[in-house]
């Protein structure tokens, strides 16, 4: 089975170390996922929006790494908005165990933030993708 392609959204000004950690984990031979694209430092313009939209459209799902200042990150908010508009599955990852992490502006009330352990990360990648796929109904159960 091919690796799950991920767009990694994070606060570049404050959480570069979290980016590095997830990137390192993705390179493990048995990870089952790859970071195909990530937040960039480019100025946010219409061109930036189009580029990020193309990148998010090309992945299977989005991981939003949440740190202490994620709620005030305009870039993370925009990336999450694009993921929602493109109907890409995503989940929020609690980036710092010992600190209070904030949800990005624009996140939904029912978006859960998951602890970051290897097992939870693996489970969330698989279940987020599985839950986003339409469920198939056997012919015999369909209404005529």
Which residues fall in each region the model found?
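C-terminal helix of von Willebrand factor
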Residues: 113-144
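Short beta-alpha junction loops
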Residues: 41, 90-100
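Conserved N-terminal substructure of TIR/SEFIR domains
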Residues: 1-58, 138-144
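Short, well-ordered alpha-helix to beta-strand connector turns
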Residues: 59-60, 110
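Glycine-rich, charge-decorated loop segments at or immediately adjacent to ligand/cofactor-binding or catalytic sites
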Residues: 98-114
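Conserved TIR/SEFIR loop-to-helix hotspot centered on a Trp-containing motif
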Residues: 68-86
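Arginine/glycine-rich "motif VI" loop of SF2 helicases in the C-terminal RecA-like domain
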Residues: 27-31, 82-92
């Amino acid at each position: 089975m091919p690796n799950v392609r991920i767009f990694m959204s994070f606060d570049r000004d404050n959480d570069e170390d979290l980016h590095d950690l997830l990137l390192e984990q993705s390179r493990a031979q048995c990870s089952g996922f790859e970071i195909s694209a990530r937040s960039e430092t480019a100025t946010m313009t219409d061109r930036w929006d189009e580029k990020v939209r193309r990148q998010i459209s090309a992945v299977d799902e989005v991981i939003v790494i949440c740190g202490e200042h994620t709620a005030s990150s305009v870039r993370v908010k925009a990336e999450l908005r694009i993921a929602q508009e493109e109907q890409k599955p995503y989940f929020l990852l609690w980036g710092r165990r010992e600190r209070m992490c904030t949800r990005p502006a624009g996140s939904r009330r029912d978006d859960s933030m998951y602890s970051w352990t290897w097992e939870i990360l693996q489970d969330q990648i698989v279940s987020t993708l599985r839950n986003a796929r339409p469920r198939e109904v056997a012919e015999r159960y369909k209404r005529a």
